[in-house]
């Protein structure tokens, strides 16, 4: 099987997860990753046998720390077919001219503005539209969670409108410069929050409004979602739809899975690396239906949920899989993703 050659620019929260996911795929080769600082994650990459590429001006700094770079970022781009930009939000735009000069396909993250790429991407919603594109933007963690649920529900009936409240984590576990520590902060105070606008980059005709607050936790986001459909459905219909959708798990609170802390502990007990939960978690008991109205609560692990979509985005631009079903089957099998109910 011919394998697409992939590089990852950035080896932080998303980059390291995407890089390791690429290494598990049968049709992809991880050529290398980039680092700008010779820190512990650079040493970790080397320990995993991952070639590390650095800015030209940083070669000696890395060598002084005992890290021998495989080359420069420009040299990495000469060796790859696809580059996944996992740099901090807004930085991808600075790198884009470099990618274009190298003639590589580009995958950006949701921290970039939508106009950076030809298409904003979510596997369950628009995989086929992404085939053969030069550039894609994988939408943010919260948007990925919303879109998985919305595009799943839309299999039952067209979705007329969505109203959602996003309860955001304040920081990732490793972050020390973010907050709040002792407050609940509207983010933003004005309505809508940016999440609705981001959903509309994939589903432009959807009537959606979101509001968001940030709370002092690091584990996961929580969404409280109200959707109105074009025709009445039953609760059994909704449960069955979520249960049969890839990358969605129904959590039964009666088994002690009634909080994000317990979900994370369950992931630890499963032996998940970094307690990653790439699946969207929908609380089974929260699902309520009243005719055309559907309500539920869901949890999003912000560090991991976009990883499968990044892998699918690589397949889309490289045209390695022609359908969403095909790429989901390969990605989810290789990453050990679950669907159905837990525990």
From Swiss-Prot:
<dbReference type="InterPro" id="IPR020831">
    <property type="entry name" value="GlycerAld/Erythrose_P_DH"/>
</dbReference>
<feature type="binding site">
    <location>
        <position position="169"/>
    </location>
    <ligand>
        <name>NAD(+)</name>
    </ligand>
</feature>
<keyword id="KW-0324">Glycolysis</keyword>
<keyword id="KW-0963">Cytoplasm</keyword>
<dbReference type="InterPro" id="IPR020829">
    <property type="entry name" value="GlycerAld_3-P_DH_cat"/>
</dbReference>
<dbReference type="GO" id="GO:0009089">
    <property type="term" value="P:lysine biosynthetic process via diaminopimelate"/>
</dbReference>
<dbReference type="Pfam" id="PF02800">
    <property type="entry name" value="Gp_dh_C"/>
</dbReference>
<dbReference type="InterPro" id="IPR000846">
    <property type="entry name" value="DapB_N"/>
</dbReference>
<feature type="active site" description="Nucleophile">
    <location>
        <position position="141"/>
    </location>
</feature>
<feature type="binding site">
    <location>
        <position position="111"/>
    </location>
    <ligand>
        <name>NAD(+)</name>
    </ligand>
</feature>
<dbReference type="GO" id="GO:0005737">
    <property type="term" value="C:cytoplasm"/>
</dbReference>
<dbReference type="GO" id="GO:0006096">
    <property type="term" value="P:glycolytic process"/>
</dbReference>
<comment type="subunit">
    <text>Homotetramer.</text>
</comment>
<keyword id="KW-0560">Oxidoreductase</keyword>
<feature type="binding site">
    <location>
        <position position="302"/>
    </location>
    <ligand>
        <name>NAD(+)</name>
    </ligand>
</feature>
<comment type="pathway">
    <text>Carbohydrate degradation; glycolysis; pyruvate from D-glyceraldehyde 3-phosphate: step 1/5.</text>
</comment>
<dbReference type="GO" id="GO:0051287">
    <property type="term" value="F:NAD binding"/>
</dbReference>
<dbReference type="InterPro" id="IPR036291">
    <property type="entry name" value="NAD(P)-bd_dom_sf"/>
</dbReference>
<dbReference type="GO" id="GO:0050661">
    <property type="term" value="F:NADP binding"/>
</dbReference>
<feature type="binding site">
    <location>
        <begin position="13"/>
        <end position="14"/>
    </location>
    <ligand>
        <name>NAD(+)</name>
    </ligand>
</feature>
<comment type="similarity">
    <text>Belongs to the glyceraldehyde-3-phosphate dehydrogenase family.</text>
</comment>
<dbReference type="InterPro" id="IPR006436">
    <property type="entry name" value="Glyceraldehyde-3-P_DH_2_arc"/>
</dbReference>
<dbReference type="GO" id="GO:0008839">
    <property type="term" value="F:4-hydroxy-tetrahydrodipicolinate reductase"/>
</dbReference>
<dbReference type="GO" id="GO:0004365">
    <property type="term" value="F:glyceraldehyde-3-phosphate dehydrogenase (NAD+) (phosphorylating) activity"/>
</dbReference>
<keyword id="KW-0521">NADP</keyword>
<feature type="binding site">
    <location>
        <begin position="140"/>
        <end position="142"/>
    </location>
    <ligand>
        <name>D-glyceraldehyde 3-phosphate</name>
    </ligand>
</feature>
<protein>
    <recommendedName>
        <fullName>Glyceraldehyde-3-phosphate dehydrogenase</fullName>
        <ecNumber>1.2.1.59</ecNumber>
    </recommendedName>
</protein>
<feature type="binding site">
    <location>
        <begin position="195"/>
        <end position="196"/>
    </location>
    <ligand>
        <name>D-glyceraldehyde 3-phosphate</name>
    </ligand>
</feature>
<dbReference type="Pfam" id="PF01113">
    <property type="entry name" value="DapB_N"/>
</dbReference>
<dbReference type="InterPro" id="IPR020828">
    <property type="entry name" value="GlycerAld_3-P_DH_NAD(P)-bd"/>
</dbReference>
<dbReference type="InterPro" id="IPR020830">
    <property type="entry name" value="GlycerAld_3-P_DH_AS"/>
</dbReference>
<dbReference type="GO" id="GO:0047100">
    <property type="term" value="F:glyceraldehyde-3-phosphate dehydrogenase (NADP+) (phosphorylating) activity"/>
</dbReference>
<keyword id="KW-0520">NAD</keyword>
